């Protein structure tokens, strides 16, 4: 007489396809012979990731429910808050932040294996050599420390950040040569002479800094300017409005320059090596002052003088961000492909046909009908934009359409073209969407306030949908079978949403549900 153990493996696996996940597991746990198939079977019902994460065959589960915290624990290093020297740091911890009342550091308190370390702003103790292990690569020092001894920051540190309120004198040699990323906070205003090591590639000096960054000395009877900024620096962020700033101190190795300056800018001032330039000035910028190699320009000027934007911007610039500056529509040069600005109004042909990516940051006066060229494929109505959208406002070739957080206006039926595949409604949007979403949208995002019925509103081509915190509508017959991923931003109330009624309204095609 045959027993079940005599059945062919393919036959057993075929029989298991007719069972629910629970019955599959119960069946295979009846004997050791069947248990060997546990990693060969596919499981089709939704399971909480936290329950299956430790299983060797967890990849066999086709449908998984994630919570943000679970996913972050899986993919990121957990930060351990160290409150006292007596705290037991869990094995495997790689990131530590000292707590508010942690104010005394002894040797060995921070163990080997820590990669990221942050001292809170209340820490007020002398930092000595050996306090920080040689495994730390990322170090953040806030407004603490009576003093930092030479050698107290180990040679393993590559990224060093001084917090927003840090304003202590740093001795020569304290910052090791291993540091390549160095950022000072907004109130730092101490001398940096011989402080910055020669291997730093990224350097940031912020608002309050008003110290010399160079000096003139005689070398062989010749007066020369000596820069405190190493020639190794390639990314220089200087946002201080220091009137004594001298462009001559900038090396030809700098490729990214972001600067706030209150003086005239002449041709030759900015190094020719710069390819990305952020510039804020309330003084005159002369034509040809921007080097030919610059392709990305953020140009927030308070004062244009006698020169137009076309005179200041050369043909090699493809990415142009005008920040809060309001510029006449006809001043945008040809050749710009990525444009961000704040026009007061738009007219036909005001934006050149070279623009493919357009971000508008403010509310425009009047109609924008046929004003945006068909070359635009990415359109972002950002910031305060809050105009009604009519047919003709959005060109037919736009593929990605984003409405900013302030947008909450009606959208005329057919106003969003069928070319759009990615559609994002902003935080405040809470209007009906029936006959609004075009048929080809694959990725759809609703903001925080959206809470309208979506039955018959979602097209059959949509794959991914994200809902905001306020959404509380029925999903029954509302999610098309094309959807494979759902995201719900319910925060702490997420756990109360998982029930039989809720899950029964989820299409079988959905394989991932994320609550966050």
Curated annotation (Swiss-Prot):
F-box domain residues: 4-49
Keywords recorded for this protein, A-Z: Repeat
Statement: the UniProt record of this protein carries the keyword Repeat: yes
Pfam family, one: FNIP
Organism whose genome encodes this protein: Acanthamoeba polyphaga mimivirus (APMV)
Protein name, per record: Putative F-box and FNIP repeat-containing protein L414
FNIP repeats: 123-165, 166-208, 341-383, 385-428, 429-470
């Amino acid at each position: 007489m045959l027993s079940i153990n005599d059945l062919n493996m393919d036959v057993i696996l075929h029989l298991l396809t007719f069972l629910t996940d629970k019955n599959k597991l119960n069946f295979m746990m009846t004997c050791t012979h069947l248990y060997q198939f546990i990693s060969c079977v596919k499981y089709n019902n939704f399971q909480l990731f936290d329950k299956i994460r430790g299983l060797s065959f967890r990849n066999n589960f086709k449908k998984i429910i994630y919570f943000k915290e679970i996913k972050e624990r899986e993919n990121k290093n957990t930060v351990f808050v160290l409150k006292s020297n007596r705290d037991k740091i869990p094995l495997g911890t790689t990131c530590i932040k000292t707590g508010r009342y942690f104010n005394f550091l002894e040797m060995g308190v921070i163990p080997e294996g820590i990669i990221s370390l942050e001292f809170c702003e209340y820490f007020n103790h002398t930092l000595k050599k050996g306090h920080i292990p040689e495994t730390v690569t990322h170090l953040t020092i806030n407004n603490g420390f009576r003093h930092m001894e030479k050698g107290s920051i180990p040679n393993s540190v590559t990224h060093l950040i001084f917090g927003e309120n840090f304003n202590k004198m740093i001795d020569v040699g304290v910052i090791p040569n291993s540091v390549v990323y160095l950022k000072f906070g907004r109130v730092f205003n101490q001398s940096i002479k011989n402080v910055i090591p020669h291997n730093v590639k990224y350097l940031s000096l912020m608002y309050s800094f008003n110290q010399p960054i160079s000096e003139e000395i005689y070398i062989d009877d010749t007066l020369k300017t000596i820069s405190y900024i190493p020639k190794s620096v390639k990314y220089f962020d200087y946002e201080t409005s220091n009137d004594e700033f001298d462009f001559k101190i900038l090396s030809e190795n700098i490729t990214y320059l972001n600067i706030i300056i209150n003086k005239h800018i002449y041709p030759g001032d900015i190094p020719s090596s710069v390819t990305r330039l952020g510039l804020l000035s309330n003084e005159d910028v002369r034509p040809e002052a921007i080097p030919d190699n610059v392709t990305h320009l953020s140009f927030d000027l308070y004062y244009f003088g006698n020169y137009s934007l076309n005179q200041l911007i050369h043909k090699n610039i493809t990415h142009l961000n005008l920040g809060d500056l309001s510029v006449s529509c006809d001043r945008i040069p040809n050749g710009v492909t990525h444009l961000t600005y704040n026009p007061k109004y738009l007219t036909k042909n005001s934006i050149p046909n070279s623009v493919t990516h357009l971000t508008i940051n403010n509310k425009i006066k009047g109609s924008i009908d046929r004003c945006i060229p068909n070359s635009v494929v990415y359109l972002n109505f950002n910031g305060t934009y809050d105009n009604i959208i009519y047919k003709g406002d959005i060109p037919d070739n736009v593929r990605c359409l984003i409405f900013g957080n302030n947008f909450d206006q009606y959208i005329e039926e057919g106003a969003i073209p069928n070319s759009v595949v990615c559609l994002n409604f902003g935080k405040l949007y809470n209007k009906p969407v029936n006959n609004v979403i075009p048929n080809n949208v694959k990725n759809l995002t609703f903001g925080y306030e959206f809470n309208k019925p979506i039955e018959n509103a979602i097209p059959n081509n949509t794959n991914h949908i994200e809902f905001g915190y306020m959404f509380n509508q029925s999903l029954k017959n509302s999610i098309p079978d094309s959807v494979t991923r759902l995201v719900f931003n319910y925060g702490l109330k997420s756990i109360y949403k998982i029930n039989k009624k809720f899950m029964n309204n989820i299409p079988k095609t959905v394989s991932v549900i994320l609550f966050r």
